[in-house]
């Protein structure tokens, strides 16, 4: 009986701690879009681009622009 009461009290205490922590962290991430674009631009830097004169399309990335199927 004592063990059951101890388990119930422990579960209630942990639940209360999680709820308090969740309320405290609400609204701390102010610029969500900035983080996602920064992450995306970082991944774009690691991909290699095609030099000018190379063929381009949907799957290839040019260092400049893709014009009429060729990188410029």
UniProtKB/Swiss-Prot annotation:
SS bond list: 49-63, 56-66, 62-71
Keyword line: Calcium channel impairing toxin, Disulfide bond, Hydroxylation, Ion channel impairing toxin, Knottin, Neurotoxin, Presynaptic neurotoxin, Secreted, Signal, Toxin, Voltage-gated calcium channel impairing toxin
Upper classification of the organism: Eukaryota, Metazoa, Spiralia, Lophotrochozoa, Mollusca
Tissues and organs where the protein is expressed, per its UniProt entry: Expressed by the venom duct.
Family annotation (InterPro entries): Conotoxin, Conotoxin_omega-typ_CS
UniProt propeptide residues: 23-48
Protein's recorded name: Omega-conotoxin-like SVIA mutant 2
Assigned protein family: Belongs to the conotoxin O1 superfamily.
Record's subcellular location: Secreted
Organism: Conus striatus (Striated cone)
Sequence positions bearing 4-hydroxyproline: 55
GO function term, MF aspect, one: calcium channel regulator activity
Main location: secreted
The keyword ATP-binding is assigned to this record: no
Primary role: Omega-conotoxins act at presynaptic membranes, they bind and block voltage-gated calcium channels (Cav).
Top-rank taxon: Eukaryota
UniProt comment concerning the protein's domains: The presence of a 'disulfide through disulfide knot' structurally defines this protein as a knottin.
Signal sequence bounds: 1-22
Pfam families assigned: Conotoxin
PROSITE patterns referenced in this protein's UniProt entry, alphabetically: OMEGA_CONOTOXIN (PS60004)
GO terms for cellular component: extracellular region; host cell presynaptic membrane
């Amino acid at each position: 009986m004592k063990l059951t009461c101890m388990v119930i009290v422990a579960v209630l205490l942990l639940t209360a701690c999680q709820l308090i922590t969740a309320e405290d962290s609400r609204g701390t991430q102010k610029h969500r879009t900035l983080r996602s674009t920064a992450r995306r631009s970082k991944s774009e830097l690691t991909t290699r681009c095609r030099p000018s004169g190379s063929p381009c399309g949907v799957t290839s990335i040019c260092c400049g622009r893709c014009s009429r199927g060729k990188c410029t």
